[in-house]
């Protein structure tokens, strides 16, 4: 699974960790996160994230 970064604040969503504080379980691929999920640091939507090139 690929990591995604917030283009506004630099937060990196790692699917291995998920975002359990906001209802996203570890192992959840970015495409499977609910559309109303927002960046836990700055509050922007999923449309402000882009795939991390590794």
Curated annotation (Swiss-Prot):
Its cofactor is Fe(3+). One of its GO terms (molecular function) is iron ion binding. Signal peptide: none annotated. Keywords: Electron transport, Formylation, Iron, Metal-binding, Transport. The modification N-formylmethionine is found at residue 1. Fe cation binds at residues 6, 9, 39, 42. The keyword Transport applies. The keyword Electron transport applies. Binds 1 Fe(3+) ion per subunit. GO terms for biological process: alkane catabolic process. It comes from the Bacteria. Residues 1-54 form the Rubredoxin-like domain. InterPro entries: Rubredoxin, Rubredoxin-like_dom, Rubredoxin_dom, Rubredoxin_ET, Rubredoxin_Fe_BS. SUPFAM superfamilies: Rubredoxin-like. Rubredoxin is a small nonheme, iron protein lacking acid-labile sulfide. Its single Fe, chelated to 4 Cys, functions as an electron acceptor and may also stabilize the conformation of the molecule. Belongs to the rubredoxin family. This is Rubredoxin. The lineage of its organism: Bacteria, Bacillati, Bacillota, Clostridia, Eubacteriales.
């Amino acid at each position: 699974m690929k990591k995604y970064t917030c283009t506004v604040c630099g937060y990196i969503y790692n699917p291995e960790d998920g975002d359990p504080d906001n209802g996203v379980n570890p192992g959840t691929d970015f495409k499977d996160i609910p559309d109303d999920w927002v960046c836990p640091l700055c509050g922007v939507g999923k449309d402000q994230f882009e795939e991390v090139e590794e």
